[in-house]
Curated annotation (Swiss-Prot):
Protein name, as recorded: Toxin Td9
Superkingdom, natural source: Eukaryota
Residue list for modification Lysine amide: 71
Residue pairs linked by disulfide bridges in the UniProt entry: 18-69, 22-44, 30-50, 34-52
Homology family: Belongs to the long (4 C-C) scorpion toxin superfamily. Sodium channel inhibitor family. Beta subfamily.
Keyword presence, Acetylation: no
Subcellular location: Secreted
Domain LCN-type CS-alpha/beta, chain residue ranges per copy: 8-70
Length: 73
């Protein structure tokens, strides 16, 4: 019997609701941050933010519909 695991890809978000920036970070930064949320891999994308692959569904990712970046808490 096989087990199906749901995974998603997307931009990591910080506590402030903004995409996790990587412009001034070392090359391995995004891959390390993605693995912290059990993602399989990640890189610094053209928007200069960390993009992760194969993260579990519970991991928070940036979504334009629910964007809270810069809106305060």
């Amino acid at each position: 019997i096989g087990m199906v695991a749901e995974c998603k890809d997307g931009y990591l978000v910080g506590d402030d609701g903004c995409k996790m920036h990587c412009f001034t970070r070392p090359g391995h930064y995004c891959a390390s941050e993605c693995s912290r949320v059990k993602g399989k891999d990640g890189y610094c994308y053209a928007w200069l933010a960390c993009y992760c692959y194969n993260m579990p569904n519970w991991a928070p990712i940036w979504n334009s519909a629910t964007n809270s970046c810069g809106k305060g808490k």
